[in-house]
Amino acid sequence: MTKKRVLSGVQPTGAIHIGNWLGAIRNWVSLQNEYDTYVCVVDLHAITVPHDPQQLKENTLRTAALYVACGMDPKKCSIFVQSHISAHSELCWLLNCVTPLNWMERMIQFKEKAIKQGDNVSIGLLDYPVLMAADILLYDADLVPVGEDQKQHLELARDIAQQRVNSRFNKESKSILKIPKPLIMKEGGKIMSLIDGNMKMSKSDPNENSRIALLDSPEIIKKKIKRAKTDSFLGLEFDNNQRPEANNLLGIYSMVSNQNREAVQKEFSNIGWGKFKPILTDAIIESLNPIQQKYYSLIKDKTELNNILNKGYIKANTISNQTLKRVRNALGFLDKPIS
């Protein structure tokens, strides 16, 4: 029986943090046993905002290495770099030409980021969701793991595929582009900031204390947890809207210690922050230790990492070119010459 295909990825911008790991990457690790899994380092998306070229190169390798260090198995999944597959850019352009401008202008994330960038906002930032649609549609993905903040982008990909390509250019019964479905993972879906329990933990937050990077040292982790925002209530609890920080920090502990919420609630219902924070700190350090060891082993000698990316490229390139050829033919382009 053919496995359903899953596609996901992370931008190589900033340091990957425990929110990325617990909210996304750790879920992908479990998915690779059940699905035909493709994991991409989405570096083309990283240049929609001002960036440092050398830092981009380093972050791209770092992100790929962390995928493997977190448990993505190259024998079970394909790990590749987005910009290595030229079909991403070509399909993006083809989709650009059939996607209405007003669809882009109503995207929430563009509006938010455009305000921050002012006159420096790029066309690439406006077009970001079309490139994301190309990423998804290029691999005939059946399912795409998404958080609540990405659901709008997946809906756009579905609309472009169905309304702007399949409905307009399909001359046969078989669809040109597969319509993907969202795969929403509930546990760890959203890890919040350490300094504001109402805000999502983010790589772009200028305050380093808002997040714990996967490569943070034990000393740094200890300092960040010590400074993490808390409240004045005695005892810790989940699901109290007046205590977002308690819910967040307990949730992190539950996941890094692999204990269910009921057990965690029982353990800490009568304990104060002063006793809880050192316990949380130790649990995070212990959970990140094997990831850090594997990462530094990979990054020290990049031969294995480059082989992994090359293997992923070959498989991803083959599938992406098949999809691109279908779209090119449907839109009326001549077949490319055989070199």
UniProtKB/Swiss-Prot annotation:
Positions contributing to L-tryptophan binding: D135
Gene3D superfamilies noted in UniProt: HUPs (3.40.50.620), Tyrosyl-Transfer RNA Synthetase (1.10.240.10)
MF-aspect GO terms: ATP binding; tryptophan-tRNA ligase activity
Keywords: Aminoacyl-tRNA synthetase, ATP-binding, Cytoplasm, Ligase, Nucleotide-binding, Protein biosynthesis
Catalyzed reactions: tRNA(Trp) + L-tryptophan + ATP = L-tryptophyl-tRNA(Trp) + AMP + diphosphate + H(+)
Nucleotide-binding found in the keyword field: yes
Motif ('KMSKS' region): 200-204
Cellular component GO terms, alphabetical: cytoplasm
EC supergroup of this enzyme: ligase
Motif 'HIGH' region location, chain numbering: 12-20
Localization per record: Cytoplasm
Enzyme Commission designation: 6.1.1.2
GO terms classed as biological process: tryptophanyl-tRNA aminoacylation
Keyword match Ligase: yes
Binding residue positions for ATP: Q11, P12, T13, G19, N20, G147, E148, D149, I191, K200, M201, S202, K203, S204
Entry-linked HAMAP family: Trp_tRNA_synth_B
Family: Belongs to the class-I aminoacyl-tRNA synthetase family.
Subunit structure, interactors included: Homodimer.
Its job: Catalyzes the attachment of tryptophan to tRNA(Trp).
Protein's name in the database: Tryptophan--tRNA ligase
Chain's gene name: trpS
